Amino acid sequence: MKKIALILITGLLAEAYGNEAEALKADSPLVLVPSNPSKCKLEKGAGPDGADAYVVYGDPKSKAKGYLTWSCPRVEYSPGTWYGVAVDVNRESCGSEVIFDNAFHRELRSSYLRRGWHQFKTCFRTFDGTNAIVDAYRIQEYNSQGRTAFANPRLVELRPEWRMEAGLELGAGEMAIGNRYTFNNDLKNPLSSCQRPFLYATMGARTGYKLDATGTCEYVYRFTLGNRSWLSASVVVAPTELVGPVKIVEFSNDGGKSWVQVGAMTDARDHEFTLPPELFPCRELTMRIRIIGADGKSRVQFRQIALEAMFDGAPVRLAGATRVYEKASGRLFLEDSARDYLTETFGAQLPASSHSLKVWAASSGRKVMRDAAVPVASTERILFKTSANEAESAQLVFTPTEDIFDIRVSVKKFDLPGTTMQILRERYHRVTLTTDQRGVSGWWPDALMPQDSDRLVVKGGESQPFFLRVKPPKDAKKGIYNGTLEVRYVGIDGQKTLDVPFAVEVFGFCFPERLSLATTFGLNMGVVANYHKAKSEADRRTLLRKYLKVLADSHIATHPITLAKPTLKWTNQNDPDGVKLEIDWTEFDRDMTEFYDGLKLNNFRFRIEGIGYSDHDNLHEPVIAGVKRGNPQYERLMGMYLTEVQRHLEKKGWIDGVWVQTFDEPTSQHFEYVRWQNSLVERYAPKLRRLMTPTDGPNLAISGINIWCPVPYHLHTEDLPKCRTRGDDIWWYICCSPPGTWAGMHIDHPGVDLRVWSWQSWDENVTGLLYWMVNWWTGRSGYADPQRPQNPYLDPAGWGKRAKPLSRAHVWGNGEGRFIYPPVACADARQSETVLDGPNSSYRLELLREGIEDYEYFAMLKRLDPSNRLLKVPESVTRRLDDYSTDPTAMEEHRIKMAREIERLKQGSRDVGHDEQ
């Protein structure tokens, strides 16, 4: 089929397409007509490069919700055919749902559509059959909040190709490591409908952002692996919504001639089914998911389907990849090879390595999977390169041929007194459903555990990493310092001991204590108190101190950093002339002195009383001292309060670090309210920096803001340069699920992600990182009973807040909202006694720390030489926000170059150990 141009026109053409009109075909222009000509308008030349724009106008103040649609009423699709849709989009206001929709496919990707013209692409496959299928194609916006424009839309027939290697064909979502095969149909991936195992869906079943089925219908997948035979398998099916009759999962090993039911689903939770032995061995497995006893109200949506299987033959290491081409032109339309990093070999064997136990070193930037390949390369020692007062990390990995037990690693000797070395065991978490196309089902490392947390067993053929973190003292002098690690373990023939040499090269400068990159991460002390069973204010303060210390060691400031609030005492508040305000700062000042000053933090959030702090789900009325907004006395009281807050923070020397936030993630319907809030703060306390997390990027329509904090894919707006010019700070945040090709914070993402986030921050002149929470350990969507919360060690998923377990499930991603873990003694919050131990860190938090320290190298170098060529981030590290290297080598090499340059520029200093205090 030739490429089809989608031509949109106004409602004047709608009458031409009644039920009896001939369906438009391949070489005919497809005509889209508006559902509401007063709100869907053609704007000549308003698109990119002078193209016409097809615009939807919504009213952010309207409470009415509904669809505004541009559609081609009748399109003829060939059966069993792949198609792609490409359209330029400029979504000027967030808060709505943009939907690309027909009978085969329903694509929602609203959070990734942004201000400024950019191209959106998606794929789908039509139902099998012998006859052409006539249906509409729709571009819709639900609950439109403003202006959204489309241009240059086109529909093309596609031809998919899958990676062929070693006689095996694997596509995106598939992986074979050793003799283990995995498949995840990540539905956030625009190529999910072009995955190799997807065979067909019947009428009523649609692919897209979620598998969406109503009435009687079915989805069918077929799994083959060349000439290999399947030996065993299990499948996980995860509904997000399930209403009506039973949905059953069936498998066939004879191409669908006979079926075996392996499970049934009656509620919206993750369902895992093991396939019965009588299906094996076999060359192919066909899976069918269908609704039985359907009625008009039947509905099911799936967020993911995952299959794990063992196969025969020689072991392999292969990640699948998919490319889809436009059939008529041969041009590449989309591609996905997001899992390639999982098959790479890295690291080097150490002298202690033997036939029965491989001992090897790996960069901290590589996640060591249990099935990691042992490297062929060798090295004489583990080498750390760092400055005085700076932490640096590496991994020590053990891969035995037979089971070993109770590995313990300790420092036997070291030449540099005052150096601290943490040696933590990496704990694996079973990921059954991936966050996005970067991940794979299996065991992923994350929590960093004390070595005495339990008795460790390492199975033969599997790898176990230890995370090493070394930090020289402030007064350490330039040089190379040698040391030895002692390793003890129990093998099949008893206790064993071996030595592992290491060295620390200390650069000729000292790392600063208070850093340049602002970080502010949410900490929920209510969750901490619940898990630890804190019984008193003293318990809560002890825990706060320990949690803040662990996070500050990775340069993370939290919001809040104190449980204390200034106490306001009003007298005569109803008397405009006699009103007085006294603020008791005692407890607040005590905590700020201990935590903000003592931990050398570089920013803190101050929560303003009376301003009506809100978010897009919860609007709160501004009230201070019982006086509501609208009362003439309200602004007088707020003015007195804000003036005193600024005066006190200036007096204490904290004014440069403070910022305030009045509204979280406002949409256009909230802009007027946000303008009022921040203008009030600016009027009476102008030195309090005012932060906003805009859902559609920096936007000067909102006045009073001087810290803009968008998500990365909403950073580049037309107002961004203007914000910079007037001196505003630019921070950013990641939340829930950034697109899978962007750096994220999830457990099942490449190890470098959180480190490269700081490199991209420097590259984009971003000066702050924000994250919503570090200890979201349980969510009501997955764990509705508050007395039986989630154990984050056993379930890595970040579950949503809303509890509708029988009909809906909402999950954000693996590790979402979680950078630290509770102690094992209170991991499920079901113990009776109070636990006062501090939290356990995570691999991801440590890599975030390394990125923050890399950022400081850039900042130090810029202070010494503002035009230095090394201040440019190499393209070998990151080319675009959605195109970065998953190999940490280029980052590590550039960091060393910067260190050498800083040393060179500091030559002549008599005491380089104290230059950067």
Task: Give the location of each predicted region.
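Extracellular beta-strand ligand-recognition surfaces/modules
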Residues: V85-V87, K121-P153, P277-K297
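Surface-exposed binding patches on compact interaction domains or structured appendages
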Residues: R339-S378, A391, T401-L468, A476
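Catalytic domains of carbohydrate-active enzymes that cleave complex glycans
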Residues: G173, G178-D186, R323-A338, E609-V674, ...
